[in-house]
Amino acid sequence: YVGYNSSKPADDTLLVGRITNSIGEILGTVVNYACHPTTLAWENLKISPDFLGTFKELMKENTGAPSLFIQGASGDLAPAAQYSGNVALAEKHGRQLAFSTLAVLEGMSTPGKSLFFKETVASGAPLAIWKSKPVPAASNMSAEMITIEMEIQ
């Protein structure tokens, strides 16, 4: 379906991936969200990253690492307030996406760890007790960058 479709719910899924080094420092984030960066339109006569500029700035400022935005399937998905020349509106949309992403990052488990259910404790109502444990080494991945000199032919 192309264009606005009032008979179907919009996909508002925000997928966030975190890339860390071996001591848990964030090296980068990957963010997938279905929304065209179309806040700014014909009233804006400058080249602009739209809301993604503010998003990337805030992510770098708060994590110390770059972020990669991957636009999800968004044939009909765009900001409700859009087609404007108002740069402040695009910046607002960028802050909304960045702060939502940062909230997801804050809620993620510590790199290399996972939560598991330990027990229930009775305290007027059954309370779940969760503990942290290391992730098995087989599920950890690592990478190394190497440089190869090649002659141009």
Feature-to-residue mapping (PLM):
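Non-catalytic substrate/cofactor recognition surfaces at enzyme active-site rims
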Residues: Y1-Q153
